[in-house]
From Swiss-Prot:
Source organism of the structure: Idiomarina loihiensis (strain ATCC BAA-735 / DSM 15497 / L2-TR)
Keywords: ATP synthesis, ATP-binding, Cell inner membrane, Cell membrane, CF(1), Hydrogen ion transport, Ion transport, Membrane, Nucleotide-binding, Translocase, Transport
Main localisation: membrane
A Pfam cross-reference name: ATP-synt_ab_N
PANTHER family, per database record: ATP SYNTHASE SUBUNIT ALPHA, MITOCHONDRIAL
Source lineage: Bacteria, Pseudomonadati, Pseudomonadota, Gammaproteobacteria, Alteromonadales
Protein's name in the database: ATP synthase subunit alpha
Assembly description: F-type ATPases have 2 components, CF(1) - the catalytic core - and CF(0) - the membrane proton channel. CF(1) has five subunits: alpha(3), beta(3), gamma(1), delta(1), epsilon(1). CF(0) has three main subunits: a(1), b(2) and c(9-12). The alpha and beta chains form an alternating ring which encloses part of the gamma chain. CF(1) is attached to CF(0) by a central stalk formed by the gamma and epsilon chains, while a peripheral stalk is formed by the delta and b chains.
Function of the molecule: Produces ATP from ADP in the presence of a proton gradient across the membrane. The alpha chain is a regulatory subunit.
């Protein structure tokens, strides 16, 4: 068979015409070293700070150090199989996480991937984990309450929507219990919740999720889990991921509550990353920007005005303000609030709830130290009835602590001192509350009214808890309308005062406690 040169030329032409070449401009680099989850990359010329770098096997690293000849990046996940000479690509994207209503009721990791075995999540969209906080003009003052369900907090240290209230204390003082109860109390308030677990045991996170499910609060809560077994990078970024998920609701004119449990472990994870990246250490070996680490996170919790919401939603939502309330948790060592991270977070937040080991061990739970706990903006958000009735609670407790210390040395006390001590004891006893038993505004008002108006003077100290329990069931059955009215309006006037007085006098006659 003889080949014709024209046929060959024609075949070659056809082949050339069919040949498709697709070219893409890609910024590639080479791994120079892998050490403790940190990779140094040569050749990524146009890399952004915080950019996602694509690694083999559908994994990513985040570029944190941009140096003259190399990029220092921290690997998100396992890194044992990465080797020198491996090619990596820059994506041109900052880390984003899924957001939306579909995340409610789910447990996700730092990257927003479900880890609860309930299938994939159809997100409404993706948002960057690092965002700039709303400016001064876009904010609105805090004047609506977040009810935690705790008498001691809602009466003395009230939290408002859009506030940052720090929960601080040693280990095993009930910090997580307080935050979880605050979430449980929001199940009927319309406030969406985000619980961010940083550096905790998987068993602890599982127990929290189980409790939220038991009390029906999981369906309006997102749990973001970065357990102790996760890499330092995922623990450091978890708080920002959770904040982005909470901001979704804030920016659409809804109210959200976020708990960071806890920021001490986040700071330790960030210190680990910074030291591995060879950044110069400062006080307690923390890097110089550890204040900025927490301030840029907590400033994103805010109450935004209706104009901001309208602009953000392109006019779909009008006349509604949005809020993100933050309850960051800090663990202290032997009550040392003057350490680096605690002082930083105290100065950033709008107040703190200080929990004490001695109070906790003596059976006063929640173990709130009323003397040093403060809410800097919550007073204007407090419910009227609680504000009016609860004014004397803090004073009674402060005087009681002072007099109790003095009374140890004095043998005979005058009548006024003795009555102050007895009143303080009763207030202290009444402020005790069991876990997972949050109270409504009306229930709190009744209890506080009883102690403030002297109805507990003739009740023995060890009977006060029983007295309160019987009183609440009596009010629920006999005065349901009054309780519903107080819950609905939160108002306090002469009529309500008279009704409460009559109710308590009637209850005292029953002697049913």
């Amino acid at each position: 068979m003889q080949l014709n040169s024209n046929e060959i030329a024609e075949l070659i032409k056809q082949r050339i015409e069919k040949f498709e070449v697709t070219s893409e401009a890609r910024n590639e680099g080479t791994i120079m070293s892998v050490q403790d989850g940190i990779i140094r990359i040569h050749g990524l010329a146009d890399c952004l700070q915080g950019e996602m770098v694509e690694l083999p096997g559908n994994r990513y690293a985040i570029a944190l150090n941009l140096e003259r000849d190399s990029v220092g990046a921290v690997v998100m996940g396992p890194y044992a199989d990465l080797q020198e000479g491996t090619k990596v690509k820059s994506t041109g994207r900052i880390l984003e996480v899924p957001v939306g209503e579909k995340l409610l009721g789910r447990v996700v990791n730092t990257l927003g991937q479900p880890i609860d075995g309930k299938g994939p999540i159809e997100a409404d969209g993706y948002e960057p984990v690092e965002k700039i906080a709303p400016g001064v003009i876009e904010r609105q003052s805090v004047d609506q309450p977040v009810q935690t369900g705790y008498k001691s907090i809602d009466s003395m240290i009230p939290v408002g929507r859009g506030q940052r209230e720090l929960i601080i204390g040693d280990r095993q003082t009930g910090k997580t219990a307080l935050a979880v109860d605050a979430i449980i109390n929001q199940k009927d308030s319309g406030i969406k919740c985000v619980y961010v677990a940083i550096g905790q045991k998987n068993s602890t996170i599982s127990a929290v999720v189980r409790k939220l499910e038991e009390h029906g609060a999981m369906e309006n809560t997102i749990v973001v889990a970065a357990s102790a077994s996760e890499s330092a990078a995922l623990q450091y970024l978890a708080a920002y991921s959770g904040c982005t998920m909470g901001e979704y609701f804030r920016d659409r004119g809804e109210d959200a509550l976020i708990v960071y449990d806890d920021l001490s472990k986040q700071a330790v994870a960030y210190r680990q990353i910074s030291l591995l990246l060879r950044r110069p250490p400062g006080r307690e070996a923390f890097p110089g920007d550890v204040f900025y680490l927490h301030s840029r996170l907590l400033e994103r919790a805010a109450r935004v005005n209706a104009d901001y919401v309208e602009k953000f939603t392109d006019g779909k939502v009008k006349g509604q303000t949005g809020s993100l309330t933050a309850l960051p948790i800090i663990e202290t060592q032997a009550g040392d609030v003057s350490a680096f991270v605690p002082t930083n977070v105290i100065s950033i937040t709008d107040g703190q709830i200080f929990l004490e080991t001695d109070l906790f061990n003596s059976g006063i739970r929640p173990a709130v130290n009323a003397g040093v706990s403060v809410s800097r903006v919550g007073g204007s958000a407090q419910t009227k009835i609680i504000k009016k009735l609860g004014g004397g609670i803090r004073l009674a407790l402060a005087q009681y602590r002072e007099l109790a210390a003095f009374a140890q040395f004095a043998s005979d006390l005058d009548e006024s001192t003795r009555s102050q001590l007895e009143h303080g004891q009763r207030v202290t006893e009444l402020m005790k509350q069991k876990q997972y038993k949050p109270m409504s505004v009306a229930q709190m008002a009744v209890s506080i009214y009883a102690v403030e108006k002297g109805f507990l003077k003739d009740v023995e100290i060890d009977k006060i808890m029983d007295f309160e329990e019987s009183l609440q069931s009596f009010m629920a059955s006999e005065y349901a309308e009054l309780m519903a009215e107080i819950d609905k309006t939160g108002n306090y006037n002469d009529d309500i005062d008279a009704q409460l007085k009559a109710a308590l006098e009637k209850f005292k006659q029953t002697q049913s406690w």
